[in-house]
């Protein structure tokens, strides 16, 4: 990325998305560098597989909820306020998951947090529509990232690979292509909904054959 863009096109800002002040400061930094905010992508997310009854109510619920749920809420709020202050339309794109709509073993907190993202997307889209602000979400399935590699460590890598219709993990670049479309003017009619990008993950059960 750094070889493709110069300092006038790309800026960096380290922020803890569980702290609203830091999220707000990130938005202000973008405005100071580029003049305005046009698009906000709330992408930060974490998760760790663990059986529900083995949970520590604090250690296994709060950290995931704070990043996945509070972080998206703070991003929506900070971006929405900036768009309102600018008097300009804008787009807010949240990263959800197929697990927002599906039950699964060992991912209780993650699923709950992503279900919240879907509802925040709907509610924010409704409230912000009069300001010309569009809010939508993308729901990836199994994406080949370091976070997914946790399943290698517990011997489930080949099993989860077969949960895609074509039995291949989605690559991050493929999700980026969907995101680029959703925040573009070509997706102007897409609002208040979550778009699946999962290679059919949620539309079939694990195959008996093959």
Describe every region a protein language model picked out.
Residues 103-111, 123:
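Active-site loop-to-helix junction immediately N-terminal to the catalytic Tyr of the SDR YXXXK motif
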């Amino acid at each position: 990325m750094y070889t493709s863009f110069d300092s006038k096109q790309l800026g960096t800002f380290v922020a803890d998305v569980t702290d609203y002040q830091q999220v707000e400061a990130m938005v202000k930094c973008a405005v100071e560098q580029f003049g305005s905010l046009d698009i906000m992508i709330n992408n930060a997310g974490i998760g760790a597989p663990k059986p529900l009854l083995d949970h520590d109510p604090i250690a296994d619920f709060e950290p995931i909820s704070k990043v996945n749920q509070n972080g998206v809420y703070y991003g929506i709020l900070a971006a929405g306020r900036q768009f309102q202050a600018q008097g300009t339309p804008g787009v807010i794109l949240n990263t959800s998951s197929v697990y927002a709509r599906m039950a699964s073993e060992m991912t209780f907190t993650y699923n709950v947090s992503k279900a919240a993202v879907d509802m925040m997307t709907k509610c924010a889209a409704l409230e912000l529509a009069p300001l010309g602000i569009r809010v939508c979400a993308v729901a990836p399935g199994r994406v080949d990232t370091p976070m997914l590699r946790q399943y290698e460590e517990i011997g489930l890598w080949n099993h989860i690979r077969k949960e895609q219709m074509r039995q291949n993990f989605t690559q991050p670049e493929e999700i980026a292509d969907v995101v680029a479309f959703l925040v573009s003017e070509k997706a102007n009619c897409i609002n208040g909904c979550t778009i699946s990008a999962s290679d059919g993950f949620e539309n079939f059960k694990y195959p008996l054959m093959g």
